[in-house]
């Protein structure tokens, strides 16, 4: 498996316009690229006029060929002007999906952006979060506009929008290099997928009027119109989807279903990192969020450690899980930057993470990761001398280096970020153990231990291993894992530690006061005892000293017995869960014979889930990395917006995946 893409090879012509060496074509008009964008795409799709009459909260544009981002900048600026002039309009958000096979190098991007200083704030933000060369979707927020930049071939990525995106796109910018220069992109598969994903009365616009393109779009189902071309071009095309075609769902058992809500009233059960990240993404969309936390304070369970590592899980044999973590890592950094910009205080250090090849098994794992072709800023193998230099202390083994890794203080982050959200209107109820959920005609009733009842339109379960305490979720294959993290005093040697050190455990650099480190963590499945264990305390010390046989490790001393225990939530395949809560009895009735239904090519209905009930779960030991993208994915599903992950990743994170895998094989689910 590989996750990398290639950079574009370009040069700049005498007009300072970027030209593709791969396709021998300009990125935008030599005459006036911005004027061409306005005429061909903004006017061609009649965006302003359609926004005026739009009745939904978001508008979705998809584009083939991101290039320098000129089209995106132009439409984002136009949308900002629209929002300023129509503050009370129902249309609040713009989603822009773009596909780019060969992304520009950052140096070329910077040079190309010099031509349009009027977009300086947008281009600077894009440059800051310009993605690594990782295949798939990279979500970047620009206020009320969200960019989903899909890197890789559009013929591979566009189908990954999946069943969920059927008839959800309002307008298309059919851009890219000319059909004569890039015939592979301009084909019937593209046009048919465009039609499938376009809303009724949705539109497209393109700079070309090539006969093959026109006929292909008409054959797909679009009503195509010729209009005057831009500049020296005689004609260009635009069109509408007037009539829908029924499209069979490819995986109806995994279909994500948005919430039905009028008041945007959302309850989240849980007080940790999963709950926080869902709340952040919901608040940005205007939701009214209420948090129900069982403890008397937030972040007292798995999110309560003093220090935690931030880096992706790359050693999984499941390519979709690795793919998720690569994108979660990138998106998580964006969220941390947002928190810092909001002056949310939390200890952190972007110091890198070292993964030690401390035995044969770990060396094999790291060798497999090195074959994924990841960019150096994500992962690179280093010899013992190089890794020791990064870590700041001598090591006797080679290992992997994650340059963009970090540590942060989870409890500080969660508590202070929730305090920030509270000022934005989020209601936080502590000492509220919700014991039962009852479905209402519209929404859910929550009942606490004292018998008090609360009603909300939408409920999200984000309470870790206790998610299965409800009758609606008791069949989910989740289990608890006890983890004890030791807090140790620093020393002259340990103060030299410059990065997070991972082996069969982990050791963090000193905290910001330079007084202590965290070392952990024990791993005891199906154990929810939160009392201190002297044995696990000693094991945390012994693992380091056995795995990293260096004299400096003798400075590690856990005898003060300072530690905290958290209970993590996990699942056998180690991938998180996010999305709708599946209705087990209904799905069992519909899918127990799924193997034969597929074999006989009989119709299969969409999955029945509990309406307006969602979860984000099984974050395991990587919650700091996974929670931000899980929260954003969940908010996108709830609001019926484009997702920041591929259909394949969504299936891999679906709560019913273990059941479906059995039903697809003809096996029983107990």
UniProtKB/Swiss-Prot annotation:
Major site of localization recorded for this protein: cytoplasm
Residue span of region tRNA (mnm(5)s(2)U34)-methyltransferase: 1-242
GO molecular function annotation: flavin adenine dinucleotide binding; oxidoreductase activity, acting on the CH-NH group of donors; tRNA (5-methylaminomethyl-2-thiouridylate)(34)-methyltransferase activity
Chain intervals for the UniProt region annotation (FAD-dependent cmnm(5)s(2)U34 oxidoreductase): 269-670
Catalytic activity: 5-aminomethyl-2-thiouridine(34) in tRNA + S-adenosyl-L-methionine = 5-methylaminomethyl-2-thiouridine(34) in tRNA + S-adenosyl-L-homocysteine + H(+)
Alphabetical GO biological process terms: methylation; tRNA wobble uridine modification
Protein name, per record: tRNA 5-methylaminomethyl-2-thiouridine biosynthesis bifunctional protein MnmC
Organism for this UniProt entry: Haemophilus influenzae (strain PittEE)
Gene designation per UniProt: mnmC
């Amino acid at each position: 498996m590989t996750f990398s893409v290639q950079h574009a090879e370009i040069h700049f012509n005498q007009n300072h316009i970027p030209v593709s060496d791969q396709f021998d074509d300009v990125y935008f008009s030599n005459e006036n690229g911005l004027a061409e964008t306005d005429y061909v795409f903004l006017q061609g799709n009649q965006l302003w006029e359609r926004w005026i009459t739009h009745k939904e909260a978001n508008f979705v544009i998809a584009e083939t060929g991101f290039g320098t981002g000129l089209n995106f900048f132009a439409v984002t600026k136009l949308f900002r002007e629209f929002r300023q002039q129509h503050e009370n309009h129902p249309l609040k958000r713009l989603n822009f999906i773009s596909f780019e096979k060969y992304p520009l190098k950052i140096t070329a991007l910077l040079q190309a952006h010099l031509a349009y200083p009027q977009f300086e704030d947008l281009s600077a933000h894009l440059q800051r979060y310009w993605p690594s060369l990782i295949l798939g979707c990279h979500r970047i927020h620009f206020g009320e506009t969200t960019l989903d930049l899909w890197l890789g071939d559009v013929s591979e990525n566009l189908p990954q929008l999946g069943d969920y995106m059927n008839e959800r796109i309002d307008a298309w910018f059919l851009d890219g290099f000319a059909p004569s220069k890039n015939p592979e992109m301009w084909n019937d598969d593209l046009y048919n997928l465009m039609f499938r994903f376009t809303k009724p009365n949705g539109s497209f616009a393109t700079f070309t009027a090539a006969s093959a393109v026109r006929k292909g779009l008409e054959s797909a189902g679009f009503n195509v119109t010729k209009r005057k071309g831009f500049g020296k071009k005689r004609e260009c095309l635009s069109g509408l989807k007037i009539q829908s075609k029924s499209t069979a769902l490819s995986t109806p058992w995994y279909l994500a279903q948005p919430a039905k809500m009028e008041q945007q009233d959302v309850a989240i059960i849980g007080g940790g990192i999963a709950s926080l990240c869902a709340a952040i993404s919901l608040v940005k969309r205007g939701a009214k969020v209420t948090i129900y936390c069982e403890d008397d304070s937030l972040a007292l369970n798995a999110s309560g450690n003093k220090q935690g590592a931030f880096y992706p899980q790359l050693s999984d044999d499941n390519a979709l899980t690795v793919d998720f973590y690569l994108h979660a890592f990138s998106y998580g950094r964006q969220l941390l930057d947002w928190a810092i910009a909001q002056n949310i205080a939390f200890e952190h250090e972007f110091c890198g993470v070292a993964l030690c090849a401390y035995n044969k098994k770990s060396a094999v794992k790291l060798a497999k990761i090195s074959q994924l072709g990841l960019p150096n800023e994500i992962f690179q193998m280093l010899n013992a001398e190089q890794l020791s230099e990064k870590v700041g202390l001598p090591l006797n083994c080679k290992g992997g280096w994650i340059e963009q890794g970090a540590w942060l203080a989870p409890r500080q982050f969660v508590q202070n970020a929730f305090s920030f959200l509270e000022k934005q209107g989020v209601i936080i109820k502590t000492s509220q153990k919700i014991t039962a959920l009852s479905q209402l005609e519209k929404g859910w009733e929550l009942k606490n231990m004292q018998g008090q009842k609360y009603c909300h339109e939408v409920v999200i379960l984000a309470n870790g291993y206790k998610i299965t305490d409800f009758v609606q979720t008791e069949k989910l294959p989740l289990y608890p894992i006890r983890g004890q993290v030791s807090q140790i005093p620093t020393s002259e040697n340990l103060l030299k530690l410059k990065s997070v050190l991972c082996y069969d455990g982990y050791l963090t650099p000193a905290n910001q006061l330079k007084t202590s480190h965290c070392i952990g963590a024990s791993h005891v499945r199906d154990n929810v005892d939160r009392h201190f264990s002297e044995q696990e305390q000693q094991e945390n010390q012994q693992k380091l000293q056995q795995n990293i046989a260096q004299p400096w490790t003798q400075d590690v001393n856990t005898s003060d017995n300072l530690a905290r225990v958290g209970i993590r939530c996990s699942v056998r395949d180690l991938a998180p869960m996010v999305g709708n809560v599946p209705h087990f009895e209904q799905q069992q009735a519909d899918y127990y014979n799924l193997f034969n239904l597929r074999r006989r090519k009989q119709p299969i209905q969409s999955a029945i889930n509990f309406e307006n009930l969602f979860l984000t779960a099984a974050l395991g030991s990587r919650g700091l990395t996974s929670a931000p993208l899980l929260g954003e994915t969940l908010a996108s599903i709830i609001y019926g917006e484009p997702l920041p992950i591929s259909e394949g990743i969504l299936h891999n994170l679906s709560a019913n995946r273990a059941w479906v895998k059995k039903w697809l094989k003809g096996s029983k689910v107990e």
